[in-house]
A protein has these predicted regions:
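N-terminus-centered regions that define maturation/targeting leaders and the start
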Residues: 1-193
Length: 193
C-alpha cells in the first residue's frame, strides 16, 4: 500500500485504506490566505466572549475516502509550548457529517460535538471559561509574537462515542483504529505584543 508522506499519522490508528491511484485527502480554508489566518478569527476580530475570540474558521475537505462516515478536527498551537508549557488547544470537534464547515459554525454547534479548548484550562483561574463556553472554538491570541496554528482533519469509519465537553485525549483514544485518512493545513496569526 502506498504511503503519503504529506498526510499525518495518529498513534494507534489503522493503516490508510486508500488505493494507490486515489489522491490524498486535503483540507483548505478561505480564512487562511497565503499562509496567514485572517484577523477576524483571532484576538483582532470583533466576535468574542470575555475577550476570547470565538469566530471559527471555515474549511473544506476534499478527496475523503469513500468509506468515510464522519470527520473529526483539531486546531492546535504548538508555538504555545514555550509560553504555557503545552500545546494550546483552540478547537476540537467530532462527528462532523459534511466535508464543508462554514465560517462561525462553532457558534451554532449543530450537527457535531465539540470538546474543551485550552481557554477552559484550570491554570487560568478566574479567567478560565466554564466547560460549556470552552466547548467550542477559542481563537488565536498569541501573547509573545506570531504563532503558527495547525488545523488537522480526520476521516473516520465510525461515529465516535463522544458528547460536548470531551477532552483532547478522549478524542484521540476514540479515533484509534478508525482513522481512514488525515490532512493538515497551517497558518500564521500575529501576536498581541
Amino acid at each position: 500500500m502506498k504511503k503519503y508522506p504529506e498526510i499525518l499519522t495518529v498513534p494507534g490508528c489503522a493503516e490508510w485504506r486508500r488505493t494507490e491511484t486515489a489522491p490524498p485527502m486535503t483540507v483548505s480554508s478561505e480564512g487562511i490566505r497565503n499562509g496567514v489566518i485572517e484577523k477576524r478569527f483571532g484576538i483582532f476580530g470583533s466576535d468574542n466572549i470575555a475577550g476570547i475570540p470565538m469566530r471559527s474558521l471555515p474549511f473544506r475537505i476534499e478527496n475523503a475516502p469513500a468509506e468515510t462516515k464522519t470527520f473529526a478536527l483539531t486546531l492546535l498551537d504548538y508555538d504555545a509550548v514555550p509560553v504555557t508549557g503545552f500545546c494550546w488547544i483552540h478547537w476540537i470537534a467530532a462527528n462532523l457529517r459534511k466535508p464543508v464547515m462554514p465560517e462561525n459554525a462553532s457558534a451554532d454547534g449543530s450537527g457535531f460535538v465539540q470538546g474543551v479548548n485550552s481557554w477552559g484550562a484550570p491554570f487560568l483561574g478566574e479567567k478560565a471559561l466554564h466547560v460549556e463556553a470552552a466547548s467550542s472554538y477559542g481563537g488565536m491570541a498569541p501573547p509573545d509574537g506570531q504563532h503558527r496554528y495547525q488545523l488537522t482533519v480526520y476521516a473516520l469509519d465510525a461515529e465516535l462515542p463522544l458528547e460536548d465537553g470531551f477532552l483532547l485525549n478522549e478524542l484521540l483514544n476514540a479515533m484509534a483504529g478508525h482513522v481512514l485518512a488525515a490532512a493538515a493545513l497551517s497558518g500564521l496569526y500575529p501576536g498581541t505584543e
